Amino acid sequence: MEQPQTENPAPSKATSAETVESENHEALSGPEKHPQDKDGADADGAAGEQEPGDQTLPPAQDGENLECPPPEASSSPPGPACGTSPKVETAEVCSRPQELPQSPRIQQPELDFYCVKWIPWKGERTPIITQSTNGPCPLLAIMNILFLQWKVKLPPQKEVITSDELLTHLGNCLLSIKPQEKSEGLQLNFQQNVDDAMTVLPKLATGLDVNVRFTGVSDFEYTPECSIFDLLGIPLYHGWLVDPQSPEAVSAVGKLSYNQLVEKIITCKHSSDSNLVTEGLVAEQFLETTAAQLTYHGLCELTAAATEDELSVFFRNNHFSTMTKHKSHLYLLVTDQGFLQEEQVVWESLHNVDGDSCFCDSDFHLSHSLGKSHGAEGGGGSPEKQLQVDQDYLIALSLQQQQQPQGTLGLSDLELAQQLQQEEYQQQQAVQPVRTRAPSPQGRGATSGRPAGERRQRSKTESDCVLL
């Protein structure tokens, strides 16, 4: 009767060893090896009696990389039977994949921080926010207007700022707005607009969906995002207009928005009506020829629509810029972080659709102190390239004078052009004397609409004296 008592513990030990080993084998080779023979179990049990430490450690080492992937099975009863060593291994292994996502978390603050550039603006030291890449330009464009209007102020030593801080300042501005109308209905409508604006406020950090209409510089399809501009009293402009001198394009585009026009082009292409097919081709040609999303007609209408010294947001090519009008000319705020240390580069002129522009300081004086790294846009300090930039600028002013009605507006354009030209040559006289000075026939020369290539050739032959 003593043998059954000694033999009974052996099967119990074999069964526990079988359970542990079957679980480890199940993790390695699947459920096919789950059933075991009794003889094999006895052999395993004997092995478990001889080397109990080796029975538990090797399976934990073999399953080290497989211990974390099946955490869903941890609720099953055999899970806790693995002992303490698998728990230690699981803690070590599970901590490894948690360390991997930390690298993008370290990079996120770099994208979330924006450098603050301090400029003299109307006699007061004022901050503007710059961006290094395609950041949240709608948020920066709006906030820069609020900074230039002194509605939001920063500590004098502020050098960097986060998008969360900007959103907080903007939210406070929206909540501080009071309705001008006292009627109950208008107040409820105003409160609804504020609620809508606060809802879409986080979208400013990623981008806004706006849909332009080609009928006017301030025509956009209404979206909840537009309520932010309305509440803050910030005009939103674009310059993508159809030339009224092209009746075919006017008929093809009509009063449609951009999205509606794209749908129309697709529909007309598959139409059996030849007139619709032709109209679709005309509309498609309009989009292709105006891919810069700014036309000369739109530029003229934009100049006429903006008021003097008005701060607004200009939308073009999915980018939002801070814009102002000074002495009848349009300027865009330079927010490129590459110009962070360039104190004389604050504004960029907007006088043509080709992207040629010249930089100005905070007082809208032509800038000549650009760094070498910015030679692609500003001339890089080369006198010949700077003369070419100034010449293009003066030609654009005369073109604008030709398209606008004769009057005080045209005269102010000429006066500003002559002033800029005089400042340019006065600064160059300190380096080299100007041999010849001739009266500038601005009323005739610049209105001929010369191509860009001819203007470049002309600037090379007349590097000392530029005639328009």
Swiss-Prot record:
Residues 43-54, 423-432 have a biased composition (Low complexity). The record marks D413, L416, A417, L420 as: Ubiquitin-binding. Residues 388-427 are annotated as: Ubiquitin-binding domain (UBD). It catalyses: Thiol-dependent hydrolysis of ester, thioester, amide, peptide and isopeptide bonds formed by the C-terminal Gly of ubiquitin (a 76-residue protein attached to proteins as an intracellular targeting signal). It holds the Pfam family MINDY_DUB. GO terms for cellular component: nuclear body. Keywords: Hydrolase, Phosphoprotein, Protease, Thiol protease, Ubl conjugation pathway. GO terms for molecular function: cysteine-type carboxypeptidase activity; cysteine-type deubiquitinase activity; K48-linked deubiquitinase activity; K48-linked polyubiquitin modification-dependent protein binding. It comes from the Eukaryota. Hydrolase that can specifically remove 'Lys-48'-linked conjugated ubiquitin from proteins. Has exodeubiquitinase activity and has a preference for long polyubiquitin chains. May play a regulatory role at the level of protein turnover. This is Ubiquitin carboxyl-terminal hydrolase MINDY-1. It comes from Mus musculus (Mouse). The gene is Mindy1.
